[in-house]
Every structure is written in structure tokens, then in C-alpha cells.
A protein has these predicted regions:
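Beta-rich carbohydrate-recognition and catalytic domains
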Residues: 1-27, 31-86, 94-153, 157-216, ...
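Charged, gly/pro-rich active-site loop segments
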Residues: 91
Length: 302
């Protein structure tokens, strides 16, 4: 079992005066920019809940202390008709040869279903100060047979000369109706490999799926290797509208075994105000793990 000591909320939209960040802040991606700055790339949503990607800089030794933030998006929505014209959402970061790659999910509104989501990729050449899209017209992960509406939230690792990707995509059922009467997507966790960072096969392998009929979403989260195994903390969505964090392990990275009692979150201390402590009472989602010096943090949305 992995024990985590909760430290409370770092920020929300009310902490800033940004016209494009007035609602949800989600999918935090921490990045060690320097010894003095831990940059958290995050999706910042406007009144219509359309996401754009910005950042909040915090103290690496005390992430609750905010040092600065982006006054404009570092990654904006695409032009009308593009795969990301109705929102861009952070997915993961990958560094190689002095370049910082940002993988993201692009949203497009639809008529008969609420949306489609496909993955894009962008790159920063200046240590995360600016980001340029590499996929403007065609997504990195476009639709394929069996995964026609959702191929998003990719995470990449390079091992033994091979790129490995875990991502979220349609399961066999595509869409369902939740307890709230709204259409909800069925999706689980996929895996594939490639010899090239910007080119991926049009087939995948299901790495982790549902445990019961009440679940409809297995969202990619944070993955690391330790003790000869892959460890995964993911987001689990259920038809009653809730989201929580789950845990799974794998020997080969292709087939994960869920360990639903593998996470323990200890409550925040008395030094944290109720406002900062209670932000996650309804749900916990979108985890990202990072070790800074001798401390290991789990950033997430509540």
C-alpha cells in the first residue's frame, strides 16, 4: 500500500484574475524548471468550460507557495474545424535531446454525442517558457477502427530503444447514459509501441479495463517503474458521476493488475484551512507523480 499525506489545495481560478481561467483547473503536470521553480502546467477553463493550457510556478520545497503564473495561454485552442477547436487539455510531458514535449488532448464538439477527443503533441525549445504545436491539422492519435471517438491522454516512455505509449481510448461500448441522464463515454487504458516519437501504429492492446458494470472510464494517470514493476495511479469514473484514484501494477507494462486498496490518503493537518482542505471531498482525479529532492509528490485535481 502507498500512503500519501494530503497537503491541501494549491490554487483555483479564484486565486487569479484571468478572463480565460474562471472555472475548472485540471490535469496538473509538474515540471522542474530550475532549483528555484517548480512549474505546474495545467488546463485552465473559461466560463464555457473550454480549456487552454497555462502554468503556475511554485516553490519546489513548498509547492503550496505560489511564485507566479502565466498571464496568457502557453497552448491555445485550434482554429475552427480543427481537432482541438473546443479545448486543449494537458496530458503528459516527455523530455528528449533538450526538448520538452507536451502531449495534450484536443476537444471537438459534436451533435449526436457531446464531443470527440484526439491527442496532439507540442514542443518547447526554451525550457517550458513557450510551446509550439507540432500537430495543427491532424492529431498525433487520429481515429481508427474500434477507437473512433476517443484517443487521448497519452503518456510516453522510452525504454531499450523503443517508445512506449499508454493512452485512453474507446472501449467496445463507446457511449452510455449515466445516472444523471447524460451521455458518458466508455473508455479504458491502451498500450502500444513505436520506433518513432511522432508516428504510432493504428492498433493497440488493452492494458487495463473495468472491474464491474458500474464503471465507464479508466483514465490514464501517472506511471513509473520501481522494484521491477510498472506502477500506475489512474482515474476511475463510475456511472454515478464520481471519480476517484485507482492503483495497478504490471510486470511488462502491457497487462496491469488492479489493486483497489493500494492507496491510502491521510487527511490534511490542522494547519490547512477548511477551504484548502475540502476541495476534493467529491472527487479526486488526474494524478501526476513527481519526486523533488527527497520528497515525492502526487499532484491531482479535486
Amino acid at each position: 500500500m502507498i500512503k500519501w499525506q494530503k497537503k491541501g489545495r494549491i490554487f483555483c481560478s479564484n486565486d487569479f484574475d484571468l478572463p480565460w481561467f474562471t472555472k475548472n483547473g485540471m490535469v496538473p503536470l509538474p515540471f522542474i524548471k530550475s532549483n528555484e521553480i517548480l512549474r505546474i502546467f495545467v488546463t485552465m477553463c473559461d466560463d464555457r468550460n473550454i480549456g487552454r493550457i497555462g502554468y503556475v510556478d511554485v516553490d519546489p520545497m513548498c509547492p503550496e507557495r505560489i511564485l507566479g503564473y502565466s498571464h496568457e495561454p502557453v497552448l491555445d485552442i485550434g482554429e475552427d474545424g480543427k481537432f482541438d477547436d473546443n479545448g486543449v487539455v494537458t496530458a503528459s510531458l516527455y523530455s528528449e535531446n533538450g526538448k520538452l514535449y507536451m502531449l495534450y488532448s484536443g476537444y471537438q464538439s459534436c451533435l449526436n454525442v457531446p464531443y470527440m477527443i484526439y491527442a496532439g503533441i507540442a514542443v518547447s525549445m526554451d525550457n517550458g517558457d513557450s510551446v509550439t504545436k507540432l500537430t495543427r491539422d491532424v492529431p498525433l492519435l487520429d481515429r481508427i477502427d474500434g477507437e473512433w471517438g476517443t484517443r487521448c491522454v497519452p503518456t510516453i516512455r522510452r525504454e531499450n530503444g523503443c517508445y512506449k505509449m499508454w493512452y485512453t481510448a474507446d472501449s467496445a461500448y463507446a457511449w452510455c447514459v449515466g445516472d444523471n441522464g447524460k451521455k458518458e463515454p466508455y473508455y479504458d487504458l491502451k498500450y502500444m509501441e513505436s520506433a518513432e516519437l511522432l508516428s504510432w501504429p493504428r492498433q493497440s492492446h488493452t492494458a487495463l479495463s473495468f472491474a464491474n458494470a458500474g464503471e465507464h472510464g479508466i483514465g490514464m494517470g501517472t506511471i513509473w517503474r520501481q522494484g521491477g514493476e510498472y506502477h500506475l495511479i489512474f482515474t476511475l469514473r463510475t456511472l454515478d458521476g464520481s471519480s476517484r484514484l485507482g492503483y495497478a501494477t504490471s510486470v511488462n507494462g502491457k497487462n496491469f493488475i488492479r489493486k483497489d486498496n493500494g492507496l491510502l490518503f491521510l487527511p490534511v493537518g490542522n494547519e490547512v484551512t477548511a477551504e484548502r482542505a475540502d476541495f476534493d471531498v467529491e472527487m479526486m482525479c488526474y494524478p501526476e507523480r513527481l519526486t523533488v529532492c527527497e520528497s515525492t509528490y502526487l499532484f491531482y485535481s479535486g
